[in-house]
Amino acid sequence: MDIKNSPSSLNSPSSYNFGQSILPLEHGPIYIPSSYVESHHEYPAMTFYSPAVMNYSIPSSVTNLEEGPGRQITSPNMLWSTPGHLSPLAVHHQLSHLYAEPQKSPWCEARSLEHTLPVSRETLKRKVSGNHCASPVTGPSSKRDAHFCAVCSDYASGYHYGVWSCEGCKAFFKRSIQGHNDYICPATNQCTIDKNRRKSCQACRLRKCYEVGMVKCGSRRERCGYRLVRRQGNAEEQLHCAGKAKRSGGHVPRVRELLLSALSPEQLVLTLLEAEPPHVLISRPSVPFTEASMMMSLTKLADEELVHMISWAKKIPGFVELSLLDQVRLLESCWLEVLMVGLMWRSIDHPGKLIFAPNLILDRDEGKCVEGILEVFDMLLATTSRFRELKLQHKEYLCVKAMVLLNSQYDPLVTATQDAESSQKLAHLLNAVTDALVWVIAKSGFSSQQQSVRLANLLMLLSHIRHASNKGMEHLLSMKCKNVVPVYDLLLEMMNAHVVRGCKSSITGSECSPAEDSKSTEGSQNPQSP
């Protein structure tokens, strides 16, 4: 299912001409039901003060990430701290998990962050590690090397049709592409497909097969979740065999590090361009939005975009070389920021409007039907206006979005338990993306002073994106606690991770009281109670 181009009305801004060759993109829209209303509203940009000229040196040749005697580090490793943004109400009013697995310890027990997160976090780990290179799966006993089916999360038997999948989903997809695909969902085309319910709805099972990336001729070259530039030839093949070398104690990690260092800024930008996720489409109903229908549309859209965001992250060169825990933490920390950056980019050519999807276009006044969302809309529109004033270019946007992901983990709770080697790799990768942004700005034809000012202006906006994300998360949690909209699947896991992290930060090492913990548990078991 290949969709060649996105709508022309949403093409990237073209105020500058970089003169770079752009690789063709293929996007596959996904259709989910929602509501649609459109009107117009002009929202002025928020006032930003201009910074002093930064003393930011631009290396003439960025081909090695190792620090040299004359090399100035260009990565802003501490752009912001992770604030505690959750209200106490959100911590004690959770909906029940979609997975019937018991909690093995209280949420706020003062132990490592890894053991305080919900059990359902394992699903996110499976999605993140689904395309890693590792040893073949020999059975449930080899859990350290096991892969999981991207469709139903059962143990995968191998890499079939472009993704890791079990024998059941492999055989089902094979039958479907051979002609037996006239399935009809008896419900709303939103059935949950997991190990226990994968046979309940063939239509939704086939839809999920396509969503996770199953194709008729799955390519083994994409086994690691990303592709380096083709000119690297044999070096790329070494990446795809990393699992075997790891078990034999080989030096593949060093080879990978060198390969990342060898990527020029231009090559890295082209790789980010290839990694861009497809647009998610929403059908247009004929009735105006209500609070429930708008929140349902936005949460469904976010849940679909999260799946593509994980695939996008794994295509960033070097991301899958981080520890699995660090990958999960990064995604949990910044998922809403990444989605908001994409929303701002889609909206940059449409003043006063928010382009959530090509056919879901909202203006500020339409948010009046949802309590508390106007403030979030205002922040999104204001930051988008600032990007518009700066005439943000597509390649700059690609680098900024990658920086939001990679720079989202600098807080004391995380760094205290972070693997040292993985932390070094993360800093290495952030340096590479920052150098790529510097290269993109330098290619725009600005003077040296203008380049420094532009870089400073772009980096200052990252804190405003974080602020909008915090406010959006607070609003989403309040809607969930009030039972305005049900939240399922991956979106529920991400929200639960934020609740746990907020609770962990608020107690600063002390345990939550038993009364509070029981109250939270009671709220999860009785989502319909006031």
Swiss-Prot record:
Gene3D superfamilies: Erythroid Transcription Factor GATA-1, subunit A, Retinoid X Receptor
Gene Ontology cellular component list: nucleoplasm; nucleus
Alphabetized CDD domains for the sequence: NR_DBD_ER, NR_LBD_ER
Homology family: Belongs to the nuclear hormone receptor family. NR3 subfamily.
Region annotation (Modulating) ranges: 1-148
InterPro entries to which the protein is assigned, alphabetical: ER-beta-like_N, ER-beta/gamma, Est_rcpt/est-rel_rcp, NHR-like_dom_sf, Nucl_hrmn_rcpt_lig-bd, Nuclear_hormone_rcpt_NR3, Nuclear_hrmn_rcpt, Znf_hrmn_rcpt
Principal location listed in the UniProt entry: nucleus
Post-translational modifications: Phosphorylation at Ser-87 and Ser-105 recruits NCOA1.
Note on domains (UniProt): Composed of three domains: a modulating N-terminal domain, a DNA-binding domain and a C-terminal ligand-binding domain.
Cited function: Nuclear hormone receptor. Binds estrogens with an affinity similar to that of ESR1/ER-alpha, and activates expression of reporter genes containing estrogen response elements (ERE) in an estrogen-dependent manner.
An individual GO BP term: positive regulation of DNA-templated transcription
Domain annotation NR LBD: ranges: 264-498
Organism placement in taxonomy: Eukaryota, Metazoa, Chordata, Craniata, Vertebrata
PANTHER family: KNIRPS-RELATED PROTEIN-RELATED
Matches recorded under SUPFAM superfamilies: Glucocorticoid receptor-like (DNA-binding domain), Nuclear receptor ligand-binding domain
Polar residues composition-biased segments: 521-530
Residues carrying a glycan: 61
Cell compartment(s), UniProt: Nucleus
Native source organism of the sequence: Callithrix jacchus
Record feature DNA-binding region, as residue ranges: 149-214
Modified residues (Phosphoserine): 61, 87, 105
Record protein name field: Estrogen receptor beta
Residue segments, region Disordered: 507-530
Gene Ontology molecular function terms on file: nuclear estrogen receptor activity; sequence-specific DNA binding; steroid binding; zinc ion binding
Subunit structure, interactors included: Binds DNA as a homodimer. Can form a heterodimer with ESR1. Interacts with NCOA1, NCOA3, NCOA5 and NCOA6 coactivators, leading to a strong increase of transcription of target genes. Interacts with UBE1C and AKAP13. Interacts with DNTTIP2. Interacts with CCDC62 in the presence of estradiol/E2; this interaction seems to enhance the transcription of target genes. Interacts with DNAAF4. Interacts with PRMT2. Interacts with CCAR2 (via N-terminus) in a ligand-independent manner. Interacts with RBM39, in the presence of estradiol (E2). Interacts with STUB1/CHIP.
